Regions:
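Short, hydrophobic/amphipathic alpha-helical packing segments
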Residues: 54-62, 136-139, 240-243
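Short beta-strand-to-turn element immediately C-terminal to the catalytic PLP-Schiff-base lysine
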Residues: 18-19, 87-90, 142-144, 165-166, ...
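Gly/Ser/Thr-rich active-site cleft segment
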Residues: 8-10, 122-240
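Carbohydrate-associated surface elements
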Residues: 104
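Residue-level structural signal for beta-strand termini and adjacent loop
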Residues: 30-31, 100-101, 177
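N-terminal glycine/serine-rich phosphate-binding loop of ATP-dependent small-molecule kinases
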Residues: 1-97, 152, 207-208, 224-225, ...
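Catalytic phosphate/nucleotide-handling subdomain of diverse soluble enzymes
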Residues: 225, 233-260
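Pocket-flanking alpha-helical
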Residues: 109-113, 245-247
Length: 260
């Protein structure tokens, strides 16, 4: 039995096949051979095409399969990804614009406005951070500057959520995903709708959130036809690179710190 690991970076997409019994990596692939392009239409902007990530996920899986490994042996899928990127999808699940990724700084002032408007102490108590340049602020930028795009958004999500959607057909996120978007209220242990409300983001645009560790989605028949992964395979892990870093280092208790 094998577990398939997918990592969506900003420079490459890495795919690994892990042997569950031994815990060893049976095969891995990183694509492309050179770095993925990052678009910068203006100074301080950084964008990538979500379809490019998916293309390299498929290429990586096929590269491993070509080495003689059967995707039919895969019994679970885990996804890690570059954090904070904004992916906007229409009702057909198509990206409406390039993803505004983690290193894009266009929404800094919007986040600063929200911090003062909502209240500095309230934000730090409930979201443990400033709205800053995180995903919700990036979406607020789209609302202000690209109203035609904003009007077509059915759901917005993170890079890892998009790959999970392409594998499963289900639009969802995780609680840790909401946290990195500044849409999780740690004080109340629920979604931070006050942030979405401040930004004018309709609640129905936010995908349903589940756990990072546990089955939140399963691969569908389309993924089986395209990649050979059996339909119904659980996507049992999904988290951004920093939660994944903390988990890998066993930084799990209050007061512990993982630095990168």
């Amino acid at each position: 039995m094998k577990s398939l690991g997918i990592d969506i970076g900003s420079s490459s997409v890495k795919v690994s096949l892990l042997d569950i019994a031994s815990g060893e990596c049976a095969a891995s692939s990183a694509n492309p051979a050179t770095e993925m392009p990052i678009g910068s239409p203006q100074s301080g902007w950084a964008e990538q095409d979500p379809e490019m990530w998916w293309h390299y996920v498929c290429e990586g899986i096929r590269t491993i399969a070509a080495q003689g490994f059967a995707m039919s042996d895969v019994v679970s899928v885990g996804i890690t990804y570059q954090m904070h990127g904004l992916v906007c999808l229409d009702k057909q699940g198509r990206p409406l614009r390039p993803s505004i990724i983690w290193c894009d700084s266009r929404a800094v002032e919007i986040g600063a406005e929200a911090l003062e408007g909502i209240g500095r102490e309230f934000c730090l108590a409930h979201t443990l951070n400033s709205p800053g340049n995180f995903t919700a602020s990036k979406l607020a930028w789209v609302r202000r500057n690209e109203p035609g795009v904003f009007a077509q958004i059915y759901k917005f999500m993170l890079p890892g959520d998009y790959i999970a959607y392409r594998l499963s057909g289900r639009m969802s996120t995780s609680v840790s995903g909401l946290s990195e978007q500044i849409l999780w209220d740690f004080e109340e242990e629920r979604r931070a709708d006050f942030v979405a409300g401040w930004y004018g983001i309709p609640q129905e645009m936010i995908p349903e959130a589940g756990v990072s560790i546990g089955t939140e989605a399963r691969t569908d028949e389309a993924a089986e036809r395209l990649l050979g992964i059996p339909a119904g395979t659980p996507i049992s892990y999904r988290a951004g690179d920093q939660p994944n870093n903390a988990f890998s280092l066993n930084v799990m208790e209050a007061g512990e710190v993982a630095a990168t």
